[in-house]
Amino acid sequence: MKNTTETFKNSKFKKEKLVMLTAYDYSTAKIIDSCDINGILVGDSLGMVCLGYENTLSVTMEDMIHHTKAVVRGAKSTLIVADLPFMSYQTSVYDAVFNAGRLVKEAGATAIKLEGGALVCDRIKAIVDAQIPVMGHIGLTPQSVNAFGGFKIQGKNISKAKELIEDAKKIEAAGAFAITLEGIPEKLAKIITESITIPTIGIGAGKHCDGQILVYQDMLGMFSDLAPKFVKRYGNIGDDMKEAFNSYAKEVREGTFPDEAHSFKIDQSIIDEITK
């Protein structure tokens, strides 16, 4: 069954947890699509895990379109949400709608995600009015890393906690079909989740959200130097890759790869003829 924005909204009333992962390429998307996963986020996190940037701020619309196209080719039943990158929507409502349209029309995304609370609700409403589904994103919003002074947990005092609750309500009122809650205390995420009728997708926001999302490289243990506290590792793919790469290099240098089983044959009479 194909996952849609309606699937997401209905899941909250059915009390069925939603599961999302990031993906940035065809191969990963194809594997995720074959699993029991509801949605794929083509996140601007690709700037860090694919392109090697220190944060997400350098990611462009062209980057997002390129990677989203690849994911769309690989995933047929999973809902695909694509991030609007930094400065693609902050400048004006027009830019927000235009760039959201590019992610749908050019890249094939089903929905878009943008960061921010009350200040971006006019963008959310305009994009939804253009018939493009929107996922909100509040809490630790990575595009605000410089304003926050780093990747810091949000909502830990009374005023900020109340602000996040109000932001969630305003995002719902603007027409979003879901909200990502990132880097906020578990009990606050529970209050937010119970305060709105659209599903919350948590990342570092505890177990009470309506669903969860992780960066797939993090949960597979691909990078030993990138390990946020909220990430549980379900594999050690980084170590497995190193072992495989080193085994390959060793066999090439020893002359044991490729062996007969991995080589093509030719009739000896042909060899004899061409070497006369």
UniProtKB/Swiss-Prot annotation:
| Record's subcellular location | Cytoplasm
The organism's lineage is: Bacteria, Bacillati, Bacillota, Clostridia, Eubacteriales
Please state what the protein is called: 3-methyl-2-oxobutanoate hydroxymethyltransferase
The record's gene field reads panB
Name the residues that bind 3-methyl-2-oxobutanoate.
44-45, 83, 113
Say what the protein does. Catalyzes the reversible reaction in which hydroxymethyl group from 5,10-methylenetetrahydrofolate is transferred onto alpha-ketoisovalerate to form ketopantoate.
For this chain's record, the cofactor binding note is: Binds 1 Mg(2+) ion per subunit.
InterPro entries for this protein? Pantoate_hydroxy_MeTrfase, Pyrv/PenolPyrv_kinase-like_dom, Pyrv_kinase-like_dom_sf
Q: In which pathway does it act?
A: Cofactor biosynthesis; (R)-pantothenate biosynthesis; (R)-pantoate from 3-methyl-2-oxobutanoate: step 1/2
Q: HAMAP family this protein is in?
A: PanB
GO biological process entries: pantothenate biosynthetic process
